[in-house]
């Protein structure tokens, strides 16, 4: 049995063992350390002060920010023990130690050691030993993992020596620590970045950004930024508390002061100048990463928050993960029994289920050939997959550009039946039949999606609040009458913020149940908002907006319809 030290530190505490990965952002309350992911078996459990074991993290790149906030708030786990290589929470713990002096030990255990430690009641971590207490006690030596020193260019050494300023030097230190953990042989140039940590999900995001900005940080590559937590132009009319709005604006201003483009969108693939196939980029935001790799054929790992900024400040990234050809090959094959006459709800359903079945490997999806998905369908499958898996991409046979890559020799094969899809639909529909809010735009809605919604409403006025979050560029493109039609129908078009960053009172406070077409928000929404969620197609959402009633299980998933 083996266990190795990834980040140093000592600690002890009762064990919280998970067999399913967890997204720290959207899955853990940063103020208490309680698990809030309603879909996770550990929901309601406290992580603070406990030795937390899990195979890997999953989902959001923003988990690093949550991990840092937990450390700053004094409610972090006593230690983290992973069974597999993990970047997101590890990066948050690295920043907590390196920048703020709040270390959280991170360890990796081999399969047998992980299983044995998971059965312990409590664990103690010393400088060189891990000791598990309980009915089946175990003591293991802690080894140092092989961490080859990456080769540095003269430019890398100059940045590290401070020739580009203290912020870039700190950024290079972080990059090199991660490069060693990822066993990267060298750093590579990247052409563009997308920074994720612009949402005021916690004070750690603001503290980190303002600290780097105060050090004179400036990005070296074109860098867009994610959605923020307020509509910058209209927050006062929306009743947002000035203190919160001011902090959200400060966070956005810190990034723009560092030279980032004020794009304020979680869908950077809807901006102009898309990345090209094979282009080495450095994006964070899980849905954007999965879309860039899967649909565009660009190359970017799922960079954790804060590492994304460090890369933007240097233009350099560790040569690891899906930057490499071998890491893009399928490690899992899913045969989908695609229903006849399925609507657009199929794609987020498949993405959600694919992530659960392939939590840490790039999957190849077969059985969807000939369905001719739209870019909105592909956006939906990528967003849902990026929520339930740690993998940064997937392949769809006959659809995506690298689906021809041969699966790895030991790639497992799974059949996904229509009953599996029906059960996935049920798992995302825990809310009541009556809904009092319709949520569109997670990720940010496209021009096509807004036009479809206007057409589905067909001049009728909504009976429950209906909000579409999207980017400023999309709203500017809706001058063909779509924006006016949605406004007349009573639909709110909100720029800058997104559903994953929306808070009361912009999120209507009296809401009890929400209808959405987003597999991502159907998963995260209960934990983020405290409300029940219903999921369906865009047509289902339009009908819910007009009637206040959520749709039932669609006909194309009903067993009686399939056997008729």
What kind of feature is each model-predicted range?
Residues 1-21, 132-215, 300-301, 311-316, ...:
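N-terminal basic/disordered segments at the start of proteins
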Residues 3-127, 229, 449-528:
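Feature captures the catalytic cores and cofactor-binding loops of soluble hydro-lyases/lyases
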Residues 65-72, 205-212, 219-221, 346-354, ...:
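Histidine-anchored nucleotide/phosphate-binding helix
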Residues 78-84, 220-223, 265, 364-366, ...:
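Short internal beta-strands
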Residues 85, 91-111, 121-124, 130-131, ...:
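A generic, well-ordered mixed alpha/beta core segment in the N-terminal half of proteins
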Residues 276-370, 508, 522-564:
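Mobile "lid/hinge" segments at catalytic clefts and subdomain interfaces of large enzymes
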Residues 363-429:
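Acidic, glycine-rich loop-and-beta core segments that form the ion-binding/anion-interacting portion
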Residues 408-498, 531-536, 552, 563:
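Glycine-rich phosphate/ribose-binding loops and adjacent secondary-structure elements
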